[in-house]
Every structure is written in C-alpha cells, then in structure tokens.
C-alpha cells in the first residue's frame, strides 16, 4: 500500500532519486546528486501539481501534471507549491555553463535523456487540457505504484474539468504503461539525433459524471 499525497518541498531529495532510477543507471557523485535535486525541484515547481507516493515514510514515486493555458488560464498560472525562481535560474545557469561538474558517466546518460526531451518541439501535438509531465519511481517499488499515482492524477483532472490528457514519451520508456490504462496512440516521430527510437504522444479522454 502506498500513501498518495501532494508534493512538499521536503520531498525534493527523494524525488530526485526517483527521477534518477527511472532514467539512469550509472554511479552518482555528490555533484550529480546536487544537480538531480535542483532538477527535481524545478520540475515540480514549474508545473501545476505533483503527487508523491510514500512507503514506510519514504517517497518512492511521483507524478506531475500541468494545465494548459487554452484549457484554463487561471489554473495554468497556479502552482501547488511556491516557485523558487532563484533556484530555477541557478539550476539553468549552472547547467548551461558546466557549474555542476557532473561526472562523465552521468553527464553522458543525461545528455541522451536531454536530447530525447528536446525532441518535444513545435510540431509535437500536445494540445490538451492537462499534460502528464513526468511519472517516476524507485526501482524496487514499481508494482502498483504507477497505477496509484495515475489514479490520483486522474481524480485531480476530473475534479478540475479536464477532458483530455496527453503525455510525451518515447520507445525507450514504459509507454506500454499508458496503453494499459486506456491511453491511445496519437503521434510518433523518429529521433533526429542519430539514435534508434521514436518520440511518442499518447492521449486519454476522461469521462466526467
């Protein structure tokens, strides 16, 4: 059983490790961990809402959603947690100018992750009411965790009047998770940076009573 609740600032270190274990497998230095903490904080604060899953007092997963302006401008401007804009700028400039001094193995893996992320461009069909921005978990807690987080995400969307949710993912990620929960394939595009694989967009339409 997992306790699902709203994200709090104290959850940043645990969320950073969830993010790491979802996408990377190389050893980490303290500099790598510092970057992951800043990245997780910015990701959670820039979006509309984040839910975390707790197991025995430890955060072992999180899900993030962002309302689109075309759906509701007021909702799109709101954040469940207070944004720390100085932290955002610090993260951006340290990353851009190599200030984190990341280890070579982690930097190599993150560079590939970032290239995939940048495939989300102007031609990506993400017009929807709410975008599912991230779903991450610790490796040892995945059975039932994604479903529990998705159920909380879906309930939040339905209560907000959301009719459509879309997610940008890729063939290297667990896109089958979304298919099993009713998401339908919308779009695909081969990677543009020479690596085998495709970017994907999935959509689900929510039924509101």
For each predicted feature, which ranges?
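Conserved beta-strand in the GNAT
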Residues: 52, 58-67, 118, 131-136
